[in-house]
Design a protein with these regions (language model features):
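C-terminal-most transmembrane helix of multi-pass membrane proteins
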Residues: 1-9, 43-47, 140, 213, ...
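Glycine-/small-residue-enriched transmembrane alpha-helix faces in small-molecule transporters
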Residues: 1-41, 143-170, 189-193, 258, ...
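Hydrophobic alpha-helical transmembrane segments of multi-pass integral membrane proteins
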Residues: 10-15, 41-56, 71, 126-130, ...
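Specific transmembrane alpha-helical segments of multi-pass solute transporters/efflux pumps
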Residues: 21-27, 55-101, 109, 137, ...
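Hydrophobic/aromatic residues within transmembrane alpha-helices
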Residues: 33, 42, 87, 114-116, ...
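Specific alpha-helical transmembrane segments that line the substrate/conduction pathway
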Residues: 41-51, 85-119, 157, 241-260
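Hydrophobic transmembrane alpha-helices of multi-pass small-molecule transport proteins
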Residues: 48, 54, 76, 111, ...
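Loop-to-transmembrane alpha-helix entry segments
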Residues: 63-68, 95-101, 117-137, 144-151, ...
Length: 302
């Protein structure tokens, strides 16, 4: 039997659980670290660590693909990561950023339709509408209304992530670690420049950062990016992305639970309903993509 059609076995499901736990913990450890390090500078430190770890392993892209690779790095490394950590810093909770970030999946479907001419059926269209409606419902939760700018920043971050994932489809010959390595290498200097401009005193404040701040940046690079994405890459070599994606929706669910149990989140009815709509819509998009053998955007985290 073809492994891609056989579904995920027990060992692969354990890998999925490790990935989801690694990505969910990233929300918690990053939120703690962002209390000590400004978000853009934190993102730059994460990418510095990642660049140092991967620079010896990156492969050059094929001829003519350097501009595309730089565009992907700016979308994913600078704007997605930078804005998502800024959103997490402002939010004061883990639940809403973890859920809203998943809206990049319907956004990527729309961008693939617009840029690449990919078509989707009415069921996928309904799933996209349900996801976006869920963001609106979630936005009226009292916990979210305390910092509406956080919701807006995460939505903009998701737009850049969707754009980056669609552009990545045009890259060829690069493995996941080369993509991550180049994203880190190209992203560091713009983020440092943005931090110097928008976060005055951020560099000087690093002398007061404790192991919580530095450890959060290290975990974000090693635990979330290297471990989480490394295992994810192993899975998608064996199974279609659309087959793996539904299982990875456990990650935002675990992040919400960590937010409630550890971080002190108190989500209201609107967040539970809106969150279910967002994740339900993403699940339907993944299931329709699997049924129609249509490409899915790769799973991402902050």
């Amino acid at each position: 039997m073809n492994p891609a059609r056989a579904g995920l076995g027990g060992r692969d499901l354990v890998l999925v659980l490790v990935i989801c736990v690694a990505w969910a913990l990233n929300f918690l450890t990053s939120a703690w670290a962002l209390a000590e390090i400004p978000p853009l500078l934190f993102t730059a430190i994460r990418l510095v660590i990642l660049a140092l770890l991967l620079c010896a392993f990156v492969k050059p892209p094929q001829a003519g693909q350097w501009p595309l690779l730089v565009a992907v790095a700016l979308c994913n490394g600078v704007f997605h990561f930078g804005l998502s950590f800024w959103s997490l810093h402002l939010a004061g909770n883990l639940s809403s950023p973890a859920i809203v970030m998943q809206s990049y999946v319907p956004m990527a479907a729309l961008l693939a339709w617009w840029w690449l001419g990919e078509r989707f059926g009415w069921r996928t269209g309904v799933a996209i509408a349900v996801s976006f409606a869920g963001v609106l419902v979630l936005g009226f939760d009292p916990m979210v209304l305390r910092e509406p700018a956080s919701l807006l920043l995460m939505l903009v971050s998701a737009v850049f992530l969707a754009a980056g994932t669609v552009l990545m489809r045009r890259l060829s010959g690069l493995d996941v670690f080369s993509q991550q390595g180049w994203t880190a290498i190209f992203g560091v200097l713009p983020l440092l420049a943005l931090s110097a401009w928008l976060e005055p005193g951020g560099f000087a404040g690093l002398r007061h950062a404790t192991w919580i701040g530095w450890g959060g940046a290290a975990y974000s690079a090693i635990g979330s990016s290297l471990l989480g994405h490394g295992l994810y890459y192993l899975l998608v070599q064996k199974h279609p992305i659309a087959q793996v994606t539904p299982w990875l929706l456990l990650s935002p669910v675990l992040a919400v639970l960590l937010g409630v149990w550890v971080y002190g989140d108190r989500p209201g009815t609107q967040l539970w309903i809106g969150g279910a709509m967002v994740l339900g819509g993403v699940l339907l998009i993944a299931m329709r993509a699997l049924a129609r053998a249509r490409p899915m955007p790769p799973a991402e985290e902050i």
